[in-house]
A protein has these predicted regions:
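Short aromatic-centered micro-motifs
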Residues: 125
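Short loop/turn motifs at secondary-structure junctions and domain boundaries
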Residues: 81-82, 114-116
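Short, small/polar residue-rich loop motifs at catalytic or cofactor-binding pockets
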Residues: 85-86, 118-120
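His/Asp/Glu-enriched, well-ordered alpha-helical/loop segment
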Residues: 3-5, 14-108
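Short, Lys/Arg- and Gly-enriched loop/turn segments at beta-strand edges
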Residues: 108-114
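Glycine-centered positions in the ABC transporter ATPase nucleotide-binding domain
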Residues: 128-129
């Protein structure tokens, strides 16, 4: 995988550890949030959907979508005064909540791989009530 054998060995250890952690977390019913540290790297940020879709190895599409939405919101609310979303609930679609929504061309509950290609499959992207993409016809 890598030219440097040490890097390959390290990568394999991380991969093996990741497999064990996700399996054990699911067995124990641990709430898992989805996130990355790719905030300031556009190339890495673009890969987040692919990373999310890879979770199908351990979770159902429903569990993956819940993890990335309402469970993330629930766990974020635990950060107390550091919570940037104090004006309304997040992770839900209801009156007074932050209006963050994705509309996907297809059913990600049947095919979670749809989230791996947002440029093609996300037909509407809304963040805090502002529409950033709308290709609905």
């Amino acid at each position: 995988q890598f030219e440097n054998p040490y890097s390959t060995e390290k990568y394999n250890k991380v991969t093996d550890g990741t497999d064990r952690v996700y399996k054990r977390a699911k067995e124990l019913g641990v709430k898992v949030a989805f996130g990355t540290d790719a905030l300031f790297d556009p190339a890495a940020a673009a890969a987040q959907g692919r990373m999310l879709a890879k979770l199908k190895r351990w979770y159902t599409p429903y569990e993956i979508l819940k993890m990335a939405t309402s469970t993330n919101a629930e766990l974020l609310m635990l950060c107390g005064p550091r919570n940037p979303y104090r004006l309304g609930p997040i992770g839900v679609i209801e009156e007074g909540a932050y209006a963050d929504m994705l509309l996907i061309d297809g059913n990600p509950l049947e095919n979670i791989d749809l989230v791996a290609n947002p440029d093609e499959n996300f037909v509407m992207i809304m963040k805090d009530g502002k529409v950033y993409k709308n290709t609905i016809q």
